[in-house]
């Protein structure tokens, strides 16, 4: 009985020690590496990021800071300024501290 209680207590303590990250980055780190080191995978990387952002939105969760802007930049580099502006607006709405930078990017893109 005492051994069972000890095991349960230990299991409870260990499960309580698991840390949750503040933000859900998905596979961003690995995908970012692939984006720059495996240029043929750029479309897959962009698709993975957008799917991750869609999953976050479906769960009602706020994306990690900068992920929406990163998606916008990927689209901008692919020549889709309209999609880039959309993601920059989403970033500004999600993270107010990014508004000045996002507003500048949007203004510059809309001027061209």
Regions found by a protein language model. Give the residues of each.
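Bacterial Sec signal peptide processing site at the extreme N-terminus
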Residues: 11-34
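Residue signature of alpha-solenoid helical repeat architecture, marking inter-repeat boundaries
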Residues: 23, 62-63
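The tetratricopeptide repeat
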Residues: 66-67, 102
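Structural register within alpha-helical repeat arrays
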Residues: 70-71
């Amino acid at each position: 009985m005492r051994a069972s209680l000890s095991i349960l207590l230990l299991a409870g303590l260990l499960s309580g020690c698991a840390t949750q990250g503040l933000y859900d980055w998905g596979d961003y780190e690995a995908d970012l590496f692939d984006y720059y080191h495996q240029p043929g995978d750029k479309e897959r990387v962009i698709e993975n990021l957008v799917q991750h952002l869609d999953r976050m939105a479906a769960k009602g969760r706020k994306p990690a800071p900068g992920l929406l802007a990163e998606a916008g930049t990927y689209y901008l580099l692919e020549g889709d300024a309209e999609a880039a502006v959309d993601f920059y607006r989403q970033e500004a709405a999600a993270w107010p501290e990014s508004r000045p930078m996002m507003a500048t990017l949007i203004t510059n893109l809309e001027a061209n």
